[in-house]
């Protein structure tokens, strides 16, 4: 039976399995933090809302769109901030959130590494 399986695999048109790129310890820790932060459905949707904006979005706008209180939004945005996904600026008593472009580029590079896409993109260029 084992020989039959080996022969079958030789006949099939499967591509060789590609190994993903190596993650540094910092990249790995960052990804763990990012995935933990986005692992909550409400936080994921808050992040998506913030990321969809051209300008920073006020916390009051986030509260209005979700069935949560202002302290809950503050908690979720704190987790997203600590994961390096967003940044906050203050204007008087209001907090405004946006995706930090530098963090977004770093995150894209890290997720590209975890998915092994950097090599594929470079090969296509």
Question: Where do the protein language model's features map onto the residues?
Answer:
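Amphipathic alpha-helical dimerization/coiled-coil segments
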Residues: 1-30, 48, 53, 101-125
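N-terminal helix-turn-helix DNA-binding core of bacterial DNA-binding proteins
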Residues: 25-69, 91-103
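Histidine-centered divalent metal-coordination motifs
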Residues: 43, 75-76
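Alpha-helical residues within the helix-turn-helix
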Residues: 63-64, 75, 81-82
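Recognition helix of helix-turn-helix DNA-binding domains
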Residues: 71-72, 78, 90
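Divalent metal-coordination and catalytic microenvironments
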Residues: 73, 80, 97
């Amino acid at each position: 039976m084992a020989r039959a399986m080996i022969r079958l695999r030789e006949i099939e048109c499967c591509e060789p399995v590609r190994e993903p790129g190596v993650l540094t310890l910092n990249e790995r820790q960052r990804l763990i933090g990012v995935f933990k932060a986005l692992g909550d459905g409400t936080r994921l949707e808050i992040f998506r809302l913030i990321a969809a904006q051209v300008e920073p979005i006020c916390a009051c706008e986030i509260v209005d769109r979700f069935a949560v209180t202002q302290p809950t939004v503050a908690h979720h945005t704190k987790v997203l901030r600590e994961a390096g996904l967003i940044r906050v600026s203050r204007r008087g008593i209001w907090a405004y959130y946006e995706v930090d472009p530098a963090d977004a580029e770093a995150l894209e590079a890290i997720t590209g590494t975890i998915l092994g896409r950097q090599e594929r993109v470079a090969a296509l260029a």
